[in-house]
Design a protein with these regions (language model features):
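Hydrophobic, well-ordered beta-alpha structural blocks that scaffold small-molecule cofactor pockets
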Residues: 1-5, 9-164
Length: 164
């Protein structure tokens, strides 16, 4: 008991962690990681609410996502606060090997989505590519993206979306 099994880092790094300076640095890095994670969650949640309000204002209640990620999970959790139906998630990268994600149906091609009114990009890794692929499947105005994704193809800012 009390032994540390060295598996994912060099042994000298663990020796550093055991020093007061190393322990302090590891604690600081951990706190910074959690701070960034919570910041991401708060920003994503706020932007998600803006996107849902934008959709509801236009009568778009059947919403689909493009991409399985932490962002799609946050969007699914936020959806419970709005009068919308989540019709599915398209995993165009083929990375996800299941029929559901967080109780939402997963499909491999946009054409297999059940008549969404709008598709919101939630792909964190290849968001720009996903956006471009969706343009060939859906009208441009029916494809939305989170501003935090930084998609260059998506010119609208969140506040402009709700104003139009």
């Amino acid at each position: 008991k009390g032994l540390i099994k060295v598996t994912q880092a060099p042994a000298n790094r663990y020796a550093y962690y055991l020093t007061p300076k190393g322990f302090s640095e590891k604690g600081r890095l951990t706190a910074e990681y959690f701070s960034q994670s919570f910041k991401f969650f708060r920003e994503a949640r706020e932007q998600c609410n803006d996107l849902y309000e934008h959709c509801i204002a236009r009568g778009w209640r059947r919403i689909a996502f493009a991409g399985i990620s932490d962002l799609s999970e946050i969007a699914i959790m936020s959806a419970h606060e709005f009068p919308i139906d989540l019709v599915g998630i398209v995993d165009m990268n083929g990375d996800y090997d299941a029929v559901e994600f967080a109780r939402v149906r997963v499909v491999s091609k946009p054409a297999r989505l059940e008549r969404p009114d709008v598709v919101i990009v939630t792909d964190l890794r290849t968001s720009e590519d996903s956006f471009k692929k969706l343009i060939s499947e859906f009208p441009r105005e029916k494809i939305l993206a989170f501003p935090l994704l930084g998609i260059k193809s998506d010119k609208l800012k969140p506040k402009e979306r709700t104003a139009t």
